């Protein structure tokens, strides 16, 4: 069973919209290009005739959400909210597993660390046009990473590595990882963030 969370405010928002649609219309939550860096999540109306036999129906208090078979694993832990602030109201859809399928807790260490980097570290670095890739984990439990994009040549990369990435990964993989080291040659250039 998928664990998509639709907050109360989002359910109320959808219920208002659905009240203006033909009876029996619900919503569909989907991922286009799931499991890729170009993955995008969306929500659309789902009239009764659009429900497919292999869809999963997620029942909520005010509506049902239908998810196609392909999108389902990529929407694990997704959160749909309707937030209002001084700038107005907007629907937010956070799907941490849309670009990469969640790995099992007993998966090999490399896969679990790679998943953590892709879903937790890289989204933070993306704001600066950067990313990090896991190259290997050696016999001493040292994760070797390589920075790319705007991180390459950035003067803050050592701080990012030690205070951000290493700290986060060592807590998450306590007893399995001993350190995180940088393989990247940092040549400053026009692509560098700082």
Swiss-Prot record:
Q: Which SUPFAM superfamilies match?
A: Fe-S cluster assembly (FSCA) domain-like, HesB-like domain
Cofactor needs? [4Fe-4S] cluster
Assigned keywords, A-Z: 4Fe-4S, Iron, Iron-sulfur, Metal-binding
The note on the cofactor says: Binds 1 [4Fe-4S] cluster per subunit. The cluster is presumably bound at the interface of two monomers.
Instruction: Cite the Pfam families for this sequence.
Output: Fe-S_biosyn, NifU
InterPro entries recorded: Fe/S_biogenesis_protein_NfuA (IPR017726), FeS_biogenesis (IPR000361), FSCA_dom_sf (IPR034904), HesB-like_dom_sf (IPR035903), NIF_FeS_clus_asmbl_NifU_C (IPR001075)
What GO annotations for molecular function exist for this entry? 4 iron, 4 sulfur cluster binding; iron ion binding
Keyword Repeat on entry: no
Query: Which residues are recorded as binding [4Fe-4S] cluster?
Result: 151, 154
Record keyword Secreted present: no
Q: Choose any GO biological process term that the UniProt entry carries and state it.
A: protein maturation
What does the subunit comment say?
Homodimer.
Task: Give the UniProt family note.
Answer: Belongs to the NfuA family.
Q: What does this protein do?
A: Involved in iron-sulfur cluster biogenesis. Binds a 4Fe-4S cluster, can transfer this cluster to apoproteins, and thereby intervenes in the maturation of Fe/S proteins. Could also act as a scaffold/chaperone for damaged Fe/S proteins.
User: What's the name of the protein?
Assistant: Fe/S biogenesis protein NfuA
Q: Which organism is it from?
A: Aliivibrio fischeri (strain ATCC 700601 / ES114)
